[in-house]
Amino acid sequence: MLKIRFMSISKQELGRTLKRYKGVGWDQSPIFKKVYEEEYGQFGGEPFGCLVGDYYFDHSPQDVELLGEMAKIGTASHCPFIAGTAPSVMQMESWQELSNPRDLTKIFQNTEYAAWRSLRESEDARYLGLVMPRFLARLPYGIRTNPVDEFDFEEDTDGATHGNYTWTNAAYAMAANINRSFKEFGWCTAIRGVESGGAVENLPCHTFPSDDGGVDMKCPTEIAISDRREAELAKNGFMPLVHRKNSDFAAFIGAQSLQKPAEYYDADASANAQLSARLPYLFACCRFAHYLKCIVRDKIGSFRERDDMERWLNDWIMNYVDGDPANSSQETKSRKPLAAAEVQVEEI
């Protein structure tokens, strides 16, 4: 069953709260107690599957600090944190400037991004997901676009004035995909790709007269993102929402967490690091962590020997192993996210 809970707290208040418990006392903050102790760490609790913040983050010291604290809570609770990205993270005033830089990676090599790079290299950063740009929340009010029954109102939008439109945090679009995947498959793994869960459909499309006498359409995702730029953004730890030209359709092509995957001499180890930094794989691992803890907590005392519990857990987890991942359908992979699995129970 899908359950959604809301917490009314501003970004500034959240930052101040977590800052008071910074350091060794981070696990005493009311946010940690609400997310971890009252659910994941409580008998009968229902662990959170994902946290979504209607905030925008950049590389400022206070934002890096706040993201780091939320990453700690997410790691302890096995609960990713999804939020929006401010264009100022790339020294821009608007996402409409995204096509201007020749190389995005060079921006993050500047000295002022030292703390940002350190955050990305941390293990906890895999529990952070930053999406961008925003998407159009609704059509402008007007007789021909979005009539208001109570009174005659024409919203002043001409296509060129970007700030006059009503934009929404793309974190909501990702959250909708996560919820849809959970509803259809019971897992939050089908959240990326045009045909595999990453689609964002029926976006508002506003057309307006162009200067040359034709008709133009306002890009419902602020700016069109090329394939090359999308790959650059994913490499730098972002999840761009990419609009399909001349349509009301967009998609999250990838679902890369903020973490920069570690590189090893061993190719297999590097490949594993790449996978662990992607949200679909992380969501599957988090859900298994939730279930295993709850199952073991409930089963304590039901088995006489450690081997009995280990055998029972292995029988349970095999229900989610795809026996033929090379040939199975996307739906089967979404319902059975594992290619192989083994549970080991150790006495301490």
What are these regions (language model features)?
Residues 308-326, 333-334:
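Short, hydrophobic/π-rich interface segment
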Residues 38-43, 58, 62, 280, ...:
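Short acidic, glycine/proline-enriched loop segments that cap or flank alpha-helices
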Residues 28-41:
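Short, charged beta->alpha transition segments
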Residues 82-84, 252-255, 346:
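Generic beta-strand/beta-sheet core signal
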